[in-house]
Amino acid sequence: MKAAISLIIFFAILFVVIEAISYEEGKELFQKERAECVGDGQRCADWAGPYCCSGYYCSCRSMPYCRCRSDSGK
């Protein structure tokens, strides 16, 4: 019985450690992506980057000249 409880506790701790590591990696990737964004009127490509910063969307009125536009003007 003690072995089963110990095994359950071991796997619970292992799960928590794995989740903490994957959360930190995801957070780091998100911050890196936000640092490489472009602003209003700059060239963008939603499918491959560079991506528009928060508050902007990629508008492709004439391919391949896509530009970041403000979300407020939609």
From Swiss-Prot:
* Pfam families the record matches: Toxin_7
Propeptide stretch(es), residue numbers: 21-34
Cysteines engaged in disulfide bonds, as pairs: C37-C53, C44-C58, C52-C68, C60-C66
- Which SUPFAM superfamilies is this protein grouped with? omega toxin-like
Q: Which PROSITE patterns match?
A: MU_AGATOXIN
Which positions bear Serine amide?
Answer: S72
Q: Which UniProt keywords apply?
A: Amidation, Disulfide bond, Ion channel impairing toxin, Knottin, Neurotoxin, Presynaptic neurotoxin, Secreted, Signal, Toxin, Voltage-gated sodium channel impairing toxin
Tissue-wise, where is it found? Expressed by the venom gland.
One GO term describing the cellular component: host cell presynaptic membrane
Highest taxon of source: Eukaryota
Q: Which GO terms describe its molecular function?
A: sodium channel regulator activity; toxin activity
Give the location in the cell. Answer: Secreted
Q: Which residues form the signal peptide?
A: 1-20
Which family does the record claim for this protein?
Belongs to the neurotoxin 07 (Beta/delta-agtx) family. 02 (aga-3) subfamily.
State what this protein does. Insecticidal neurotoxin that induces an irreversible spastic paralysis when injected into insects. Modifies presynaptic voltage-gated sodium channels (Nav), causing them to open at the normal resting potential of the nerve. This leads to spontaneous release of neurotransmitter and repetitive action potentials in motor neurons.
The record's domain comment reads: The presence of a 'disulfide through disulfide knot' structurally defines this protein as a knottin.
- The name of this protein is U3-agatoxin-Ao1b
- Taxonomic classification, please? Eukaryota, Metazoa, Ecdysozoa, Arthropoda, Chelicerata
